[in-house]
Amino acid sequence: MPVVLAEFIDYSLEWLRCESLPFPVLNFDVWNNIRGSNLHLGPCFDQTVPGQKLTLPFLKRFTESSGIADGFDCGTLVQRRQLNNTLNDSSCQDLAAKTGEILGMIKRTLARTRSCSHASIEWSPIVEKACLDFFSPGNLQRFLLLFWSGWYPNSPIIHKPTFNSEAEPPGLIASMAVLGACLSPDSNDCVRAMAWLTPVEEVVFADNILYDDSIIASSNLVGDEAVVWDKLKALHAAYFICIAQNWEGSKEGRQRVRKDRYSRIVSIARSFGLYNLSLAKLDTTFSTQQKWARFILLESMIRTATYIYLLDSAFVLYYRLPPRVISLELNTGLVCPEVCFQAESAAECFLQLHMATMGKQNQSSLTVSSAVRLLCSPHNLDLSIFHNLSSFNMFTIISALCCLVFQYQTTLVDVSQVTPAATGLSRWKWLWQRGGHIVVDSDGYSVENMWKRVGFMQHANEYYHLACAMLERWKLTEKQIGDTLAAWAAPVGSVQGNPKYDDGEMVQVKALIHDMENMTY
């Protein structure tokens, strides 16, 4: 391990020695003794049980896995095999027209972009047959089922109860199918999916509606604006193919997603107006089909904006890429409870919405940026406004706090200036422990209901530990900080082993997680 990195990790692990299990908190004496700091906090958990180790099962698996199925919560191999027993022959035939649409779309796009294509595919009768075979009606049904049951809980941005695969754009169906195929228990499906990652990527990013800046979303939409829906679905297609390409594609494909394609997605979402949406003005007192349509559109856009931010924050934390979405520009409202978004009817949805918002009027006005600001505030705060936030919302907030810590690492800040992050982390942990959040294994769900489970967001507490370990670097004295910053400022490639940016192999975060898990305290 590089010398400088080892020194960082040694210091960053000091906090573990004074932690409680299973919910560590910061060693607040560090912050209370900072000269000029107004932060005065105290630990609110019991002391450490000697000899125990911190475990970070999700982060360890995520950083060491080689693909989506192994790295994320996508159900067990047995569950994904059982999905084949739920296939319906009549549904297969209904998707025959979609197979033809996907074939025509890919063929036209590759012919049009042949001179500048990344796909390296020369269209021929053999390629056409392979395309028809991979996107056949039967395969589409299987792959979409794998998408819903395996991947969907990790990014529930589409309203499944009203989703109609026969009526959806071919680009979206192709993107979802490729991602679903990557989760197939049949290795042949996975291998064939690799061949179609880049062609589908080119198809969805060639959709002109993505770049139409005249289409702008707002909280005043009524829910039936076709052109807004079309752009949102095109954005979903681009998002899903980026997920598949980044975790299953070639080295070139992964780099293209992280450096180019995802920057486009962020820019498109920004010009689309997705970072300023909220359900605060939605009347939940009684249900109508029109209000349900409005809810579905607005909540889908809010979730899309949030997940675009979450993937960007993952690129920041794991690959040390500069952030493209700033936490404080994310003025989207917090997402609604999953039972509301999963409801099968307007009546059920609005009943759940009414119950969720009853007595929590102020919570509906929270945005991601305001939540982070409040938690990091030096002033006394009534935390009841955050009462019973979902794992989804808590994960979004801890991701923002992690990115805040990362930004400290890349600037020459004085140690007294990092107290907002320490405050935010301590308050977040207090809320998490009192929110009744537990990790639920996918085995507890029937095959038919796997799409309703909570995805990787339920492991948000592991991100808290990671943020604390990173933040402890500022526990050093003024002189030690100066020495550390001098080492970080060494020229790229120097023998000191300075931190690497655009770390495609996640070397540094893997090393940090390894050392955290192997320290006994």
Residue spans for each PLM region:
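Structural signature of alpha-solenoid helical repeat junctions
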Residues: 168, 172, 233-236, 300, ...
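C-terminal substrate/ligand-recognition segments
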Residues: 454-479
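Carboxylate/His-rich catalytic cores and anion/metal-binding grooves
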Residues: 180, 184-204
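Long amphipathic alpha-helical scaffold regions
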Residues: 217-220, 229
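Short HxH-centered metal-ligating active-site micro-motif
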Residues: 226-238
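Specific register positions within alpha-helical solenoid repeats of the TPR/Sel1-like families, i.e.
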Residues: 181, 185, 246, 402, ...
